[in-house]
């Protein structure tokens, strides 16, 4: 059975949960708390599975996969009964480009761990402006 290590507030993990449900794949959610003061993802057991110590992380038998886009591609290629991608080009490439825009251009710049670092190292006001700029730029292109 597929096992997804996930945190309920993680948008990256949410992407994978959506795909698993759209594809109607039987899976187990393994909660991994990223909450301050708990930080299960930094524990030795999780670090041994996933040295990056992030969610999502998918296990399929002995195979472990990190990073939401890699997981989505794996699910699409290996569980193709209910495809997520359109059947033809250029639609497939457009969907992939949209996914990459979110996962690579918007999400990393606005990730909570990145924003917390910026707010700690710099003032909150510039960090908030930085966040607003990248969200606006990314979603304007997506629209």
Predicted regions and their residues:
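GST-like domain detector, emphasizing the conserved glutathione-binding G-site
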Residues: 1-126
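Amphipathic alpha-helical packing segments from all-alpha helical-bundle domains
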Residues: 128-143
């Amino acid at each position: 059975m597929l096992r997804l290590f996930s945190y309920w507030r993680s948008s990256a993990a949410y992407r994978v949960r959506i795909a698993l449900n759209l594809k109607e794949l039987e899976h187990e959610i393994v909660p991994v708390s990223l909450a301050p003061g708990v930080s299960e993802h930094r524990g030795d057991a999780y670090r041994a599975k996933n040295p990056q110590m992030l969610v999502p992380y998918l296990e399929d038998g002995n195979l472990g996969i990190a990073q939401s886009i890699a997981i989505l591609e794996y699910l699409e290629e290996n569980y193709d009964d209910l495809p997520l991608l359109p059947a033809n080009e250029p639609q497939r490439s457009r969907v992939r480009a949209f996914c990459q825009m979110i996962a690579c251009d918007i999400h990393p710049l606005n990730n909570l761990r990145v924003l917390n670092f910026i707010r700690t190292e710099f003032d909150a006001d510039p960090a908030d402006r930085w966040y607003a700029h990248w969200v606006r730029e990314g979603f304007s292109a997506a629209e």
